[in-house]
From Swiss-Prot:
Membrane topology: Multi-pass membrane protein
GO cellular component terms listed in the entry, alphabetical order: plasma membrane
Assigned protein family: Belongs to the UPF0324 family.
Annotated source species: Chlorobaculum tepidum (strain ATCC 49652 / DSM 12025 / NBRC 103806 / TLS)
Protein name: UPF0324 membrane protein CT0845
InterPro entries with a match to the protein in the record: UPF0324_pro
Coiled coil: none
Keywords for this protein: Cell membrane, Membrane, Transmembrane, Transmembrane helix
């Protein structure tokens, strides 16, 4: 049988090729392509399959991407040619997707809400993170897990989990905790999409108040849209704007976390792992500003939003391929309890605020 060379191109090969002028640059580009293509293609294929299933069967796209990705975990084994590309998709592609989320938000949308909803969103996010931090520490799961889950529940679900995980210090449990958070937040968000409109009706909330409640509590954007427009068009519009305001809280939260861990690294005498404000958050703010100017045509904005969604689903698929079911089963009941408690805490806090404002 003929031997097939499966050697993965290395960074040393790339740097060596770059020394030989234009021809070397072309050769280096080819080596990079060979290095990343198998894993990126596998991740995009998982994303495409997840999108197809979601469009035809209605379940959350990210949940499908995770489950399909985990079925192909063998592609991320140490000797696999796809490993480097999968790592690229789970990090760089992820950051691109988060940065492009800024094209969903305008400053005008935030201004149109008035002061009270903005203050409510700010304190609900802050208090949910602090609650998660305290509860996680009390239950022996550590501060990082509390920040990760609290931020995910308080801000924007799976997207926030990925963005926050990107700036937290990494350890042997980081990827497992991120995947667990994404799976749990997707399940809780789906349940909230079904249950929270009924809760709004029970409390007799009008269309605007119901929109504030749904947008301020449901975890992922897609489920907010689904729940809001199932009540009324006004409720859907209000819920979407409130939700996007929560998405914008990614910027200060990620900046503060980066600042905290930057100072901690300096105190410990270690070189800082990241800049104070990661580039993908800088671009997030930049895209919010560009979108606020109204200079980007709507078809282009929609295209960018689609690219963002594809990047995030691709990254989730890659993370799934790097995660084993065994490691998830080892998490235990405490993390599940923490995330349920955070979800209930946020719902009660926002509902109380909405009733008070009404």
């Amino acid at each position: 049988m003929k031997h097939v060379d499966t050697e993965i191109p290395t960074e040393e090969q790339i740097h060596e090729a770059e020394k030989f002028g234009f021809h070397g640059q072309v050769q280096a580009a080819k080596i990079r392509f060979d290095r990343y293509f198998p894993g990126v293609l596998a991740s995009i294929t998982v994303a495409a399959a997840a999108t197809f299933l979601s469009d035809h069967y209605g379940a959350p796209t990210m949940l499908f991407a995770l489950l399909i990705g985990m079925a192909f975990r063998f592609l991320s084994e140490d000797e696999s040619r796809a490993l480097v590309g999968i790592q690229f998709a789970s990090t760089t592609v992820l950051r691109i997707g988060v940065a492009l989320l800024g094209m969903r938000i305008t400053l005008g949308q935030i201004q149109s809400l008035g002061v009270k909803p903005v203050v409510m969103v700010f304190f609900s996010v802050l208090l949910t993170i602090l609650f998660g931090l305290a509860l996680s520490k009390m239950m022996g799961r550590g501060k990082r897990f509390g920040v990760l889950t609290g931020g995910s529940v308080g801000i924007c679900g799976a997207s926030a989990a990925l963005a926050i995980a990107a700036v937290l210090p990494q350890d042997e449990y980081s990827e497992r905790n991120t995947i667990f958070t994404v799976i749990s937040i997707t399940a809780l968000s789906t349940l909230a999409m079904i249950a929270y409109p009924v809760v709004a009706q029970w409390f007799g909330l009008d269309h605007q108040a119901a929109g504030i409640f749904l947008g301020g509590t449901i975890h992922d954007v897609a489920q907010v849209v689904g729940a809001g427009y199932s009540v009324s068009e006004q409720t859907g519009d209000t819920a979407t704007v409130i939700k996007l305001l929560r998405v914008s809280m990614l910027v200060p939260v990620v900046f503060i976390l980066s600042l905290i861990f930057h100072k901690r690294n300096q105190k410990d005498g270690n070189a800082p792992r990241r800049t104070l404000l990661p580039p993908f958050i800088i671009f997030f703010v930049l895209f919010v500003g560009i979108n606020s100017l109204g200079v980007v045509p709507k078809p282009a904005t929609q295209f960018i939003n689609d690219v963002s969604r594809w990047c995030l689903v691709t990254a989730i698929g890659a993370l799934g391929m790097k995660t084993s079911l065994k490691s998830l089963f080892e998490v235990g009941w405490k993390p599940v309890s923490i995330m349920i408690a955070e979800t209930v805490f946020l719902a009660v806090l926002v509902l109380g605020s909405v009733v008070w404002m009404s």
